[in-house]
């Protein structure tokens, strides 16, 4: 008998799970319910679409090592009817910068990253200036540069490629908004949509991203994941920054090339970061008061720049420890969660899709063990703190 898997959320996480399920076992019936089929409000499409191995937790590093392997071979993996999709992967590297106060942490993280196989180069202040002459290094002690395996790509293109391949393999996508679930004891038996349709499920996957908290509440589960707005600014400047990577300032402000322009952003301070702010608004004060002054300090040529375009998207922000929550909840026998990526969902999507597929089909992780990201740590108050949240 074929198994019915219903996935709520058709962004990069949900579509990756759908793809791996159908690629691994064509007898599994997969239905993906996506409330926003145009992806106009999708975090996958609105993000800065980048990948790195410069994390402070081993599992995040390993997930992104698989992520870059997947992205490099995406055209071959996700080919449909002779068409090989391209996501314009540019391995321009991340450059994390540290002041003397942050130098020890950066070096500790670098040792972990390279031990796990990441291609990260540790640089002192002189090396930073020699490699990036446009950079102000006066207040810096060191930097860590991703020589390969880190960079940026077309996030919307990745979602579309995964979706189209999943559909070609037999996954069904339904444009609908989930408004309820039917729970029978320790199982969810049906998902109910706004139009009154009921979808039976042997397994339910919560991949609803920034909307995972209300879906979890329908299931009777309190998940510490909230929708937190992040604004991105596309700026033009006469500055010509040779070999420009995705730069992370010690303040948390970031920028990277985007064609002939740049995109930039940062996370707001906790006291200015409430839940569920509207996506049709942009935090211009954050740009004027924090981002631009920081850019101009770090790259003096950025004194002259102009905002060309700006937009906002949501982080599905795990306030517990900024890491994803992946796996079954102990109170529900047939519900898998894949939520709370806190800005890392695009790059961790392939590893999540592979792992969740293994968990559903075989009852365990067969390749990379994602169990440390399970619900147990949340329920037992054992956070896995990620220090490198951008």
PLM regions and their residue ranges:
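Flavin (FAD/FMN) cofactor-binding and adjacent substrate-gating region
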Residues: 90, 98-169, 174-175, 180-187
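C-terminal catalytic lobe of FAD-dependent flavoproteins
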Residues: 293-390
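Glycine-rich FAD pyrophosphate-binding loop
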Residues: 22-44
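Central helical "cap/lid" subdomain
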Residues: 197-244
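Dinucleotide-binding Rossmann-like beta1-alpha1 core, especially the glycine-rich loop
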Residues: 49-131, 252-254, 296
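Conserved beta-strand-loop-beta-strand element in the redox core of flavoprotein oxidoreductases
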Residues: 180-200, 204
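Active-site lid/adjacent beta-loop-alpha segment flanking the redox-cofactor pocket in flavoenzymes
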Residues: 222, 236-334
